[in-house]
UniProtKB/Swiss-Prot annotation:
Residues 17-146 are extracellular. The gene is Ptcra. Heterodimer with TCRB; disulfide linked. This heterodimer assembles with CD3 proteins into a signaling-competent pre-T-cell receptor complex. Interacts with RHBDD1. One of its GO terms (cellular component) is plasma membrane. InterPro entries: Ig-like_dom_sf, Ig-like_fold, PTCRA. This is Pre T-cell antigen receptor alpha. Component of the pre-T-cell receptor complex (composed of PTCRA, TCRB and the CD3 complex) that plays a crucial role in early T-cell development, particularly alpha-beta T cell differentiation. Isoform 1 acts to retain most TCRB intracellularly, while isoform 2 permits higher levels of cell surface TCRB expression and facilitates signaling from the CD3-TCRB complex. Isoform 1 is expressed at higher levels than isoform 2 in the thymus while only isoform 2 is expressed in polyclonal beta-only cells. Isoform 1 shows a predominant expression in immature thymocytes. It comes from Mus musculus (Mouse). Residues 168-199 are cytoplasmic.
Amino acid sequence: MARTWLLLLLGVRCQALPSGIAGTPFPSLAPPITLLVDGRQHMLVVCLVLDAAPPGLDNPVWFSAGNGSALDAFTYGPSLAPDGTWTSLAQLSLPSEELEAWEPLVCHTRPGAGGQNRSTHPLQLSGESSTARSCFPEPLGGTQRQVLWLSLLRLLLFKLLLLDVLLTCSHLRLHVLAGQHLQPPPSRKSLPPTHRIWT
């Protein structure tokens, strides 16, 4: 589910990414997104690698920071693209308070065991924090209004249904009563004579 969401995000935010040349992996960083995780702001950075190696071949994707350390990232892929090439995806989440310690951020990939590393341009995260897209919870005023209208509509339909049932029942009752008045009264059988015992 997360992978589908990230691929859709990259499709919206990075529509003009160049493809790799002659099967050489091409890493590209998407604009970072600000998330709220456990009450703390985190910066989510996604690296998309076009023309990655197919499954079974070594094609690592990793992030490195300006301080020389490699960062742990979640890597997805490779997945088959509609044009027949393979695509890999890696995501990294960093606390917003620590962004300056990890600048500049670079995404790397290697085509194989003996291949040369391919890297993105360095990404300055602290300047991106003000322009990054935010994914904070927003008030659901419109949703509450829709729920109210839906409840009102359901109540109105219920009242119409109840009125229809009552009218149908009263109409049937009138037919039953009218039918009883039109029928001749039931014939009475003659009762046997009563014998009195005189004492």
